[in-house]
């Protein structure tokens, strides 16, 4: 089983993933916990490039998208596909939906570019995607409380409003796969809501 977790900054994805990871392990199931961009040493290096705040050079939107897919291709080949072939449960903090929400909806890149990359480099999709949804201001306040903001977290509220709209578009288009979770609830309540979709 392949499960991904999506949402804007500070909505509690990491907390939910840990709870679901523990839930499956208590059932004796083998679980692989991973994230995007990242998940392998090479992909984590790409992640560092993507998140770094560079005051000397602005990363172009196309470069950002291609770096994310370079990391994703490595992640799929080295982590996700081998785990699924071994009948392990894969829990991924973000996957392709994040690229639609952030790069297409947020940055304004063409969906055709994303579709071309998905067709050529993405051979497996999650069976279930949890979209943790909360007001942008709430999530950003939580992100600020964590400390220094990365390159994405420093974006304006208007950017994250577009990102959230992107997630909403996906949710409405694929309600069977994408499950919206009310991230204004307590972490335990969000976890209980998620479990209902995994029963």
Curated annotation (Swiss-Prot):
Keywords: ATP-binding, Kinase, Nucleotide biosynthesis, Nucleotide-binding, Transferase
One Pfam family per UniProt: Thymidylate_kin
UniProt-listed Enzyme Commission number(s): 2.7.4.9
Alphabetized InterPro entries for the sequence: P-loop_NTPase, Thymidylate_kin-like_dom, Thymidylate_kinase
Disulfide cysteine pairs (residue numbers): none
MF-aspect GO terms: ATP binding; dTMP kinase activity
Gene3D superfamilies referenced in this protein's UniProt entry, alphabetically: P-loop containing nucleotide triphosphate hydrolases (3.40.50.300)
GO biological process, one term: dUDP biosynthetic process
One of the record's GO cellular component terms: cytosol
SUPFAM superfamilies in UniProt: P-loop containing nucleoside triphosphate hydrolases
Organism domain of life: Bacteria
EC class name: transferase
Chemical reaction(s) catalysed: dTMP + ATP = dTDP + ADP
Entry function: Phosphorylation of dTMP to form dTDP in both de novo and salvage pathways of dTTP synthesis.
Name of the protein described by the UniProt record: Thymidylate kinase
Origin species: Acinetobacter baumannii (strain AYE)
The gene coding this protein: tmk
